[in-house]
C-alpha cells in the first residue's frame, strides 16, 4: 500500500516536471508556451486556451484565434504582461506570435531553467521516499510488519526512487538536446 502510494506520487512528480519543461522555449513554435497565460476575462483570470484556438502554422509562428472577437485586445494585453517573452501582433482578427531564433546565451539560460525544474522534481521524489520510509518504520515500530519486511519494502522503495529519478534525468537530457539543437 505504501509502495503503491509512493509510486503514484512519484509518477505525478515526473509528469509535473514534464509540464514545467513544456513551458520552456526551444526555438520552435509550440502552443504549450502559452499554457500559463491567464486572461482577465470579465474580472476573472481565465486560461488563454479556453478563450481562443491556438495553432502553430509553421515552426516560427503561433496563431491565436479568439472565439469572440471582442477578446482580442485583452488577450494581446495578457500575452504582453506574461513572462513568455514574446510580442503579440494583432491584425484585427487573429494574434500572431513570431518566435525569434534563440541566441546562445538564451539557450544556456533555458538549459539552466530546465536543470532547475529537474532538480525540483528529484527533490520531490526524494521527499516522497522519505515520507514512505517514515511510514514503513512506524509500521515496524508498531509491530505491524517484521524487520525483514521493513527492509524489503525500503529496498523496493529505493529501486522505485532510482527509477523515477532516472526518468527525470532522461527528460532533462531530451529537453537539453531540444534547446541546444539549432
Curated annotation (Swiss-Prot):
One GO CC annotation: cytoplasm
Primary location: cytoplasm
Short name of one Pfam family: RRF
Annotated function: Responsible for the release of ribosomes from messenger RNA at the termination of protein biosynthesis. May increase the efficiency of translation by recycling ribosomes from one round of translation to another.
HAMAP family: RRF
Family: Belongs to the RRF family.
Protein name: Ribosome-recycling factor
Organism: Nostoc punctiforme (strain ATCC 29133 / PCC 73102)
Species lineage: Bacteria, Bacillati, Cyanobacteriota, Cyanophyceae, Nostocales
